[in-house]
Amino acid sequence: EYTLPSDGMIIRQMEKKGKVNRRTWFALALMLLVVPLLLYLSVRFFHGRKYLICSLIVIVAAMLPFFMMFEGRKPKAREIMVISVLAAIGVAGRAAFFMVPSFKPVAAIVILTGVSFGGEAGFLVGCLIMMLSNMFMGQGPWTPWQMFSFGIIGFLAGILYQKGILKARKRDLCIYGFLSVVLIYGGIMNPAALFMSVYQ
């Protein structure tokens, strides 16, 4: 499943390049139907006050497709370790640059995780980075929305790479990073701010 080339990078050998399997479709349905519904119910009925419970439920929903990745094969320790380290680097990077406005090295790590390990891992790492880093930056009703936004960025990066649309080139990844942060993160967080202000 993994090879270690001379440059030391772990390269994921995609199962079937260009073909999205049933597990990925299940993950997509879970992430685009269940998680947004959960976020809406949290804002509508709890007025954003139960954000920690909602965040934990989003993490559990993100872990289900991730665990399904290992169905039928034995995961290697280095695979899980690298994913854990990527999440830790994202948390540390966000905390280190907290003084710099609108600059946090989160999207790059989430995108690289999605491209290298698949969309499910990208979604999980995006969720974990936002939830754990908000322990330092400040938790609030925005936390589940941030988790969902960066999770979708990582998941979509994995899908586009698997389909051959997104190439593992610096220019392509930078363009995707810019567009995904502006359109996906901004497109989710801006309406979320409106919902949170209306229902509080």
Tell where the protein language model's regions lie, with residue ranges.
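N-terminal amphipathic/basic-hydrophobic helices that include classical n-h-c signal peptides
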Residues: E1-Q13
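Hydrophobic transmembrane alpha-helices
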Residues: E15-I111
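Lipid-exposed faces of alpha-helical membrane segments in multi-pass integral membrane proteins
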Residues: L30, V34, V60, V85, ...
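Generic transmembrane alpha-helix motif of multi-pass integral membrane proteins
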Residues: P65-M68, V106-G122, L156, L160
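Hydrophobic alpha-helical transmembrane segments
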Residues: I80-V85, A108, F123-C127, P144-F148, ...
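Interfacial aromatic-anchored transmembrane helix boundaries in multi-pass membrane proteins
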Residues: A92-A107, C127-Y161
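Membrane-embedded alpha-helical hairpins and interfacial helices in multi-pass inner-membrane proteins
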Residues: E15-L56, T143-P144, K163-Q200
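Membrane-helix interface segments
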Residues: K76-E79, G119-L124, L166-D172
